[in-house]
UniProtKB/Swiss-Prot annotation:
It holds the Pfam family CBP4. This is Assembly factor CBP4. One of its GO terms (biological process) is mitochondrial respiratory chain complex III assembly. It comes from Debaryomyces hansenii (strain ATCC 36239 / CBS 767 / BCRC 21394 / JCM 1990 / NBRC 0083 / IGC 2968) (Yeast). Essential for the assembly of ubiquinol-cytochrome c reductase. It has a direct effect on the correct occurrence of the Rieske protein, core 4, core 5 and apocytochrome b. The lineage of its organism: Eukaryota, Fungi, Dikarya, Ascomycota, Saccharomycotina. The gene is CBP4.
Length: 142
């Protein structure tokens, strides 16, 4: 039995390895749905809940990034997680991992909505008063 040259064996290993990686990449690309496709397949109730909670998730992500920046800027060791309680530490067990208080967030959104409604009503009132003050009588000259 003749033995193949060393470069041939390494070339075969490279080709087989490349084909395995390329096959996996192509399968991943064409079989995994995008976020939009996945959301479109949800039932209407789940999709509505997903849309309702989108802002809260974005707020949590912003809060997490803020904490990560603070932690990175500090001189503490990397395993100290800042304000986030680690489940591996004794005082961090049995704590709620949520970064944003949902009730407080909804209350703030409601307050902002009420303020915008009041501002809009005041603007409409000013416009109406302005129209009334500009209104001319039948016999007035100007």
């Amino acid at each position: 039995m003749s033995q193949k040259p060393l470069w041939y064996r390494w070339a075969r290993v490279g080709v087989v390895g490349f084909s395995i990686i390329a096959t996996g990449s192509l399968l991943f690309k064409y079989t995994v749905p995008t976020d939009e496709q996945l959301i479109a397949k949800f039932s209407p109730e789940i999709r509505a809940e997903y849309e309702r909670n989108r802002e809260i998730r974005q707020k949590e992500q912003q809060e997490l990034m803020k904490i990560a920046r603070e932690t990175a800027a500090s001189d503490d060791p990397i395993w100290k997680t800042g304000r986030i309680k680690s489940p591996f530490e004794k005082d961090g067990r049995n704590t709620d991992p949520k970064l944003v208080d949902i009730e407080k967030y909804n209350r703030e959104r409601g307050d902002e909505f009420k303020k915008s409604e009041v501002e809009r009503a005041q603007q409409e009132l000013r416009e109406a008063e302005e129209l009334v003050s500009q209104k001319k009588g039948w016999f007035s000259r100007k």
